[in-house]
A protein has these predicted regions:
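Non-globular, low-confidence helical/coil segments that flank catalytic cores
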Residues: 1-36, 42-49, 55-371
């Protein structure tokens, strides 16, 4: 990794700091580049506050803050040098280590959807990626989070449907594809009139122009099945003969299975899709899941009572923007979850939501654990 300068991402927006603080120190000998990166920023104290806050997540913040406070009477330039050293130490100690087993992260992209999954073999999947209230969420939220985690390739970008809050970030990732980051394949729902849906057709054209392979999945199709690790992704919706009224209607639904864990990814699917799936499930004696990614950001018409009874999840993940104009998640939907003792996790309150499934346990964590 020689020749690559210090890569430090300290964003003006504190939301970015949460995900993308110090990415990598790859050449500590290049002092000139390191100095230039830091000295160009006017307020060293503000930088320090962001860095120490994030370091605190890793247990190092208190010690580093004490060192910095003791330097308060030192000149600005010397203080900057101290900060450089502390940045290097923090970056070395904060190197991201991938959890073993299956790792799932619902990113906070505001009013939109984005879920990253990494399987036991290191294959990366991105289920949707977009936002309507965060500008350039693909570049500043999704990409930076992935790079901080050391992810240089998304093997499968799995798109539920063509709405902007699910795809505009994916398009940004495609635009950024190159030597350091690539998108391998785009997976779209297999619908009847592919050309009649403008947003759907636009996503296909975007991927084609970038030279990215596109595959199509309908109910019953298997995206991946690894018997050696008991990992499987199956498309549950839309059905081949399904008559949809809008993009949300044909929103692809996927079942994630790994050992004894299962999660249903609903995209923007609502009651009509839920009913269709339950009719198809009649032949299956049992279809229970541990986790449900709530459809359509937890809208009033998602997660019907009969559907929740059918799948009986322990937790529900809801992706929505803080104080969004749609009032997602809807209070009636939250009441249904409460009445069935289903624990909700919300990006507008919890920020990023992580699930790690190892051989013997399922661990659920949130970035904001202050609640």
């Amino acid at each position: 990794m020689a020749g690559c300068p210090l890569a430090v991402w300290i964003a003006a927006d504190s939301e970015y700091v949460k995900y993308c603080t110090i990415y990598r120190v790859s050449n500590m000998s290049n002092v000139h580049d390191i100095w230039r990166n830091v000295s160009n920023v006017c307020n060293v104290h503000d930088i320090w506050q962001n860095v120490s806050n994030v370091c605190n997540l890793h247990g190092a913040g208190r010690s580093l803050r004490n060192i910095y406070r003791n330097s308060c009477n030192i000149s600005h330039n010397i203080k900057s040098v101290i900060l450089i050293v502390l940045l290097i130490l923090a970056a070395v100690n904060m190197r991201y280590v991938h959890p073993k087993g299956l790792y799932i992260m619902m990113l906070d992209v505001g009013q939109g959807d984005c879920i990253y999954i990494r399987d036991e073999n290191g294959i990366s999947y991105l289920f949707d990626g977009g936002s309507t209230d965060v500008k350039q969420a693909g570049k500043y939220r999704i990409y930076k989070t992935l790079r901080y985690m050391g992810i240089r390739r998304i093997d499968y970008a799995v798109i539920s449907h063509g709405d902007a809050d699910h795809v505009n970030g994916i398009k940004e990732l495609i635009d950024m594809s190159g030597a350091s980051f690539t998108v391998g394949e785009v997976v779209m729902p297999d619908i009847k009139d592919k050309d009649s849906e403008e947003s759907y057709a636009g996503m296909i054209e975007y991927a084609h122009k970038a030279g990215i392979n596109i595959s199509y999945k309908k109910a019953g199709d298997v995206l991946v099945c690894d018997n050696s690790t008991a990992f499987k992704i199956t498309c549950m919706h839309p059905c081949e003969s399904y008559d949809y009224e809008d993009a949300n209607d044909y929103s692809a639904v996927y079942m994630i299975e790994y050992k004894d864990f299962s999660m249903l990814m609903m995209g923007d699917a609502g009651k009509k899709a839920e009913k269709c799936m339950m009719n198809d499930w009649k032949e299956r004696k049992e279809l229970k899941v541990f986790a449900l990614k709530a459809g359509h950001h937890g809208s009033r018409y998602s997660c019907s009572e009969v559907f929740l009874e059918s799948i009986d999840p322990a937790i529900a993940l809801i992706s929505c923007g803080k104080d969004n104009r749609y009032k997602h998640p809807h209070k009636e939907m939250l009441t249904r979850l409460h009445n069935m003792d289903i624990k909700p996790y919300r990006t507008d309150e919890d920020d990023a939501i992580m699930i790690n499934v190892s051989a013997d346990k399922i661990k659920v964590q949130v970035y904001n654990d202050s609640r």
